[in-house]
Amino acid sequence: MVMTDPIADMLTRIRNANMVRHEKLEVPASKIKKEIADLLKREGFIRDVEYIGDNKQGILRIFLKYGANNERVITGLKRISKPGLRVYAKADEVPRVLNGLGIALVSTSKGVMTDKDARQLQTGGEVVAYVW
């Protein structure tokens, strides 16, 4: 079966694993998924990410992060730009998520970055998702 939106699938897997407080999850790998996972790790939303090569597509193993009393670090994930309706933002129109408490993942010509990085570099792009 062909997957029409692999990024939405990855975000949904993270959201579902987070809701039931799983320690880790696995998703089929791709370059953009790896960039998104690395960005989530850098911003402190996930604990770790590792790539497992299997002579085919590969697998990303994502380790979720929880607080001291097992509270969730990720409270929400939302896919914004979808295959049927792409959402783009100019450099001065890059959105803020919850007044800076969350991040917007923006796919630019310089790679996937947060909304803060995109504003600093004065570059726009496709608004992939919101994480808070």
From Swiss-Prot:
**Which cellular component, as a GO term, is one annotated location?**
ribonucleoprotein complex
Ribonucleoprotein in keyword set: yes
- Output the PROSITE patterns linked to this UniProt entry: RIBOSOMAL_S8 (PS00053)
InterPro entries on file: Ribosomal_uS8 (IPR000630), Ribosomal_uS8_CS (IPR047863), Ribosomal_uS8_sf (IPR035987)
Name its GO BP terms in alphabetical order: translation
Q: What family is it from?
A: Belongs to the universal ribosomal protein uS8 family.
Write the protein's name: Small ribosomal subunit protein uS8
Gene for this protein? Answer: rpsH
